[in-house]
Amino acid sequence: MAFGKKPAQNPLFKRKRYCRFTVAGVEQIDYKDVDTLKGFIGENAKITPARLTGTKAKYQRQLDTAIKRARYLALLPFSDQHKK
């Protein structure tokens, strides 16, 4: 190994994902909790899939419904084109 070079990190290493709702002991996801819901929406206002967030299927369904209800009540934007 040459001096000044760091050993290469494993490019295939991925951090283990976990369900935030299971860890917190949440039973029901509420549409009024906008701060939590914003964490599961991308910058273009799309719902982030469970394979990226690590959310379990049960909570992903609840999350999907809660985000759609919050959008309908204008608590969250439908798209990124809305003015802030």
Curated annotation (Swiss-Prot):
GO terms for cellular component: cytosolic small ribosomal subunit. The keyword RNA-binding applies. It holds the Pfam family Ribosomal_S18. Keywords: Ribonucleoprotein, Ribosomal protein, RNA-binding, rRNA-binding. The keyword Ribosomal protein applies. Transmembrane segments: none annotated. One of its GO terms (molecular function) is structural constituent of ribosome. One of its GO terms (biological process) is translation. Belongs to the bacterial ribosomal protein bS18 family. Part of the 30S ribosomal subunit. Forms a tight heterodimer with protein bS6. Binds as a heterodimer with protein bS6 to the central domain of the 16S rRNA, where it helps stabilize the platform of the 30S subunit. This is Small ribosomal subunit protein bS18. The gene is rpsR.
